[in-house]
Structures are given as C-alpha cells and as structure tokens.
C-alpha cells in the first residue's frame, strides 16, 4: 500500500470513528431530555388563565412525568366509583368540600399506580392552603420523596381578564386556545381532533374578578410557605407561551 493510499484509508477510518462518536453522543443526549436521571417533582401555581393548561402538558411531555390536575383526578375517581371517589361524591352531594386527606390520597394513588408518574409529576390545582401543602409534604416524605420546585405564573389581573374572556377550551382534553394570543389553526376547532371548542360560561369579567380575589387570598400564604423552603420560582406569564416555557425549562435545568 502506497503512502497516499494509506493516508486515504486512515482518513476513512477517522471519518467512520467521528460518525460513530456523533451517533453515540446523540443517543446519550437524546434520552436525557426525555427520561431525566433526577426525577422532576414540581407544582405549578397560577391564577385561572395564566397558562397552566398550556405549560403543564409541555412539562409532562419534555420530562416524561405525569400531569396531575386535581380537578380532573377528582372527576375521574368519582366517575370510576373508586373508594376515594365514592367518599368524595358523598361529601360534594352534601354541599361540603372534599377533605385534604382525600385529595392527598388521590395524589398518592396516582404516584403508586400510574406508570406515567415513575419519573415524577407536575401538580396543578393543589395545594391551595398551607395545611394542604404540609399534608402533601408528609405524604411525599413517607415515600422518601420531596418537591424540587414550585413555579408560580405571575400576571397582572387586568391583562389576565382580557386573556380569559377570549379563551377557548376543548372539553374532552382540556386543551386551551385563545382567539387572539393562541388561536387554533381553524377557528373554533381543536387542532388535534377536529372537534368544536367552547367558551366557558364563567369566563366573563365579573366572575373572573371574584375568582382572582379568592386566588390571591388563598395563594399568598402557600407561596410564602414554599418561599421559606427555598422552592419558589416566579415566572412572568405576561410573555408569550414560548418565552414562558424557556424560563421554566431554565428553572428545571438548574434544580439540585
């Protein structure tokens, strides 16, 4: 083999090695974003219309965790007539509020039996009070787990009202759109299923003003609780959904 031929042969070997290295690096990086070595356990806090319904599915898909929306969980347990669902329905039919213990046990049931929760969870709609937060911490401690972040979506009330009065919902999935800020590809139609979108009857300024007042009254102590634990992160939710998502990813990437 001449010198020039040997040189070409070595170059081809180097090229093959570089291709192999690139392939292995891609494989190594690929699963990391989808199945993180460290589990993600986070809570998403925000007033109605702040973007929880947009961001929570992104967290779920990016980190392969389960999205635990407590309202949906409660309805599901009631429909399936589970022991927890039967107990909850009895309380609701009597006009009462479902107890903190029942809600925490519903979350615990998901963590124990929902395969999608094996890498962690994003919790949406709970806790709303400090006692609920304490019970949640206690349940996680029993499982030798703990929260690693609490993200609050921050937005001015008046901007929020203008957002919500244009909100459109896909009833079956909970996917949300907005007539101006995040419109569906076809007006009034869900992008994925082609089914019609609706506007909730309580998405009006008067109702929203009352709901926001309740939200601020409830949330303040819970936020202070998590701030004291060093878990709280605030994100400006007045920005576009993609910018909000980038901010949230930065928080999750920096978790310990």
Curated annotation (Swiss-Prot):
Protein's UniProt keywords contain Nucleotide-binding: yes
Catalytic reaction annotation: AMP + ATP = 2 ADP
GO biological process per UniProt: ADP biosynthetic process; AMP metabolic process; ATP metabolic process
Keyword hit for Phosphoprotein: no
Cell compartment(s), UniProt: Cytoplasm, Cytosol; Mitochondrion intermembrane space
InterPro entries: Adenyl_kin_sub (IPR006259), Adenylat/UMP-CMP_kin (IPR000850), Adenylat_kinase_CS (IPR033690), Adenylate_kinase_lid-dom (IPR007862), AK2 (IPR028587), P-loop_NTPase (IPR027417)
Any one Gene Ontology cellular component term annotated for this protein: cytosol
Region (LID): 166-203
Span list, region NMP: 69-98
The entry's keywords: ATP-binding, Cytoplasm, Kinase, Mitochondrion, Nucleotide-binding, Transferase
One GO molecular-function entry: ATP binding
Assigned EC number: 2.7.4.3
Sequence positions that bind AMP: 70, 75, 96-98, 125-128, 132, 200, 211
List of residues binding ATP: 49-54, 167, 176-177, 239
SUPFAM superfamilies: P-loop containing nucleoside triphosphate hydrolases (SSF52540)
Domains as described in the record: Consists of three domains, a large central CORE domain and two small peripheral domains, NMPbind and LID, which undergo movements during catalysis. The LID domain closes over the site of phosphoryl transfer upon ATP binding. Assembling and dissambling the active center during each catalytic cycle provides an effective means to prevent ATP hydrolysis.
Similarity annotation: Belongs to the adenylate kinase family. AK2 subfamily.
Function, as annotated: Catalyzes the reversible transfer of the terminal phosphate group between ATP and AMP. Plays an important role in cellular energy homeostasis and in adenine nucleotide metabolism. Adenylate kinase activity is critical for regulation of the phosphate utilization and the AMP de novo biosynthesis pathways.
HAMAP family cross-referenced by the UniProt entry: Adenylate_kinase_Adk, Adenylate_kinase_AK2
Subunit structure: Monomer.
Name of the protein described by the UniProt record: Adenylate kinase
Source species of the chain: Coprinopsis cinerea (strain Okayama-7 / 130 / ATCC MYA-4618 / FGSC 9003)
